[in-house]
C-alpha cells in the first residue's frame, strides 16, 4: 500500500508544470497561485484530521515551506528559460541525487550492500533517463530553439531550486514530525515565501487565481510523499515521486507544443524507459 501511495506524487507533481504552462502567467504569479491553493488544501486537511500542533511542528513546517517557495519559484524561472521538457528533467535529476544521497548516507536508510548496489543502479537509471529526456539535438538547434530561452540563466535558477527543494524534504525527514501536523505551518511558510518573491513584482489577476489548481495538485502529492517517507524512507519515496518526469516531459511536447526533432524524440522515449526501469528497481527494493 505504501508503494501505491508513493506513486500519487508522481501523477500529481508530474502534472503541475503542464497545468501551470497551460494556464500561463509569470513565474511569480504561478508560485503565488500555487501556494494559495496549497494553503486551502492544508486548511481542509487540518480540520478533517485535526492533528496536534507542537512548537517544533510549527517551526520546522514554516521553515520547510520557506525553502520550498525558493525551490518552486526558481524551478518556474528555469522552465521559462529552458522550457518545461528541458528544465524539469534537469531539475529532477539534481533533486534525485541530493535526496537519495541524503536518505541513503546521512539517514542510514540503506544498510545492506544489496541496498546500495540496487539503489545506486536505480538512481543511475533515473538520472540517465532524465539526461536523455533533456538532451538536445545540436544539428536542429536553429529550428527548435526559442529566442526567449537562456540555458545559463536556467542552470543558475536550478541550482537555487535544488537547494530549496533539498532543505524542504530533508529537514522534515530529519525531525520525524507528524506529516499531518506539518502541512498547515508548511503551507503558511510557502505563502510567506511566495509573497516575498512576488512583492511589488506580481499583478494579482486571473493567472494567480487559476494557478491555485496547481496548489491542490501539489498538496495531494506532498502529503502522500510525507506519509510514505516515514514508511519507506526519503531516498525511495522521493525518487518514486520524481517519476512524474515522464508525464511532464511528454505533456510538454504533446500538450504545450514544445517542438522536438526526430532525434530528440528518440532521446525522450529511451529516457522515459530508463526512468521506468529505475522506478521498478526502487519498488523491488521495498517489495
Curated annotation (Swiss-Prot):
GO terms for molecular function: carbohydrate transmembrane transporter activity. InterPro entries: Sugar_transport (IPR010651). Keywords: Cell membrane, Membrane, Sugar transport, Transmembrane, Transmembrane helix, Transport. It is found in: Cell membrane. It is a multi-pass membrane protein. Pfam families: Sugar_transport (PF06800). The chain crosses the membrane at residues 5-27, 32-49, 53-71, 84-106, 116-134, 155-177, 182-200, 207-229, 234-256, 265-284. Its main location: membrane. One of its GO terms (cellular component) is plasma membrane. It comes from the Bacteria. Belongs to the GRP transporter (TC 2.A.7.5) family. PANTHER family: TRANSMEMBRANE PROTEIN 144. This is Putative sugar uptake protein EF_0928. It comes from Enterococcus faecalis (strain ATCC 700802 / V583).
Amino acid at each position: 500500500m505504501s508503494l501505491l501511495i508513493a506513486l500519487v506524487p508522481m501523477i500529481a507533481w508530474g502534472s503541475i508544470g503542464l497545468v501551470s504552462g497551460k494556464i500561463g502567467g509569470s513565474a511569480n504569479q504561478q508560485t503565488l497561485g500555487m501556494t494559495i491553493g496549497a494553503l486551502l488544501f492544508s486548511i481542509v486537511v487540518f480540520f478533517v484530521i485535526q492533528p496536534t500542533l507542537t512548537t517544533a511542528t510549527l517551526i520546522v513546517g514554516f521553515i520547510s515551506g520557506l525553502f520550498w517557495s525558493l525551490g518552486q519559484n526558481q524551478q518556474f524561472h528555469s522552465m521559462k528559460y529552458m522550457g518545461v521538457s528541458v528544465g524539469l528533467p534537469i531539475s529532477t535529476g539534481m533533486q534525485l541525487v541530493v535526496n537519495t544521497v541524503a536518505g541513503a548516507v546521512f539517514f542510514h536508510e540503506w544498510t545492506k550492500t544489496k541496498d546500495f548496489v540496487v539503489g545506486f543502479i536505480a538512481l543511475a537509471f533515473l538520472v540517465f533517463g532524465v539526461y536523455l529526456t533533456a538532451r538536445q539535438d545540436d544539428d536542429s538547434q536553429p529550428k527548435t530553439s526559442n529566442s526567449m530561452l537562456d540555458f545559463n540563466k536556467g542552470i543558475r535558477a536550478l541550482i537555487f531550486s535544488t537547494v530549496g527543494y533539498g532543505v524542504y524534504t530533508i529537514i522534515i525527514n530529519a525531525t520525524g514530525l507528524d506529516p499531518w501536523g506539518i502541512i498547515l505551518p508548511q503551507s503558511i511558510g510557502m505563502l510567506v515565501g511566495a509573497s516575498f518573491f512576488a512583492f511589488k513584482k506580481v499583478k494579482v489577476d486571473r493567472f494567480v487565481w487559476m494557478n491555485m489548481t496547481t496548489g491542490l495538485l501539489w498538496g495531494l502529492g506532498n502529503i502522500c510523499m510525507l506519509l510514505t517517507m516515514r514508511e519507506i524512507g526519503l531516498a525511495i519515496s522521493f525518487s518514486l515521486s520524481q517519476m512524474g518526469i515522464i508525464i511532464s516531459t511528454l505533456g510538454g511536447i504533446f500538450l504545450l507544443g514544445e517542438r522536438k526533432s526526430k532525434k530528440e524524440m528518440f532521446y525522450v522515449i529511451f529516457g522515459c524507459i530508463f526512468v521506468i526501469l529505475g522506478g521498478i528497481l526502487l519498488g523491488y527494493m521495498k517489495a
